[in-house]
Amino acid sequence: MLNAKNRLRKRKEFGYIYKKGTKIYGQHLCIFFVPSKISAPKIGISVANKVGHAVVRNKLKRQIRHIMREFVPAIKNINLVIMIYPEIVGTTYENLKQNIQKTLQKGKIISE
């Protein structure tokens, strides 16, 4: 689970990142990010209603929060939103982790 200081919660924050942020496309996901004035990164997760039932969506969000917890120390001064596409349903945890890591590296959010 992400710490409270590392979570995006407000609709206004999500909207700002969608509007002003840079997009990075990965396999089955898209990451929007903007530079932040605060040193601690803030992370939001967006899973559309088209992605399975509520149980499936919540499981994906829990897995992504757990994965991002490992990457938080490497991320500096960035707020980001991870948007999940419906095709991701059925992928393994390890595959999801690799997809997120590759996408973060592609956008130079974390180093390789």
Put a short name on every predicted segment.
Residues 1-112:
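Positively charged, solvent-exposed patches that mediate nucleic-acid binding
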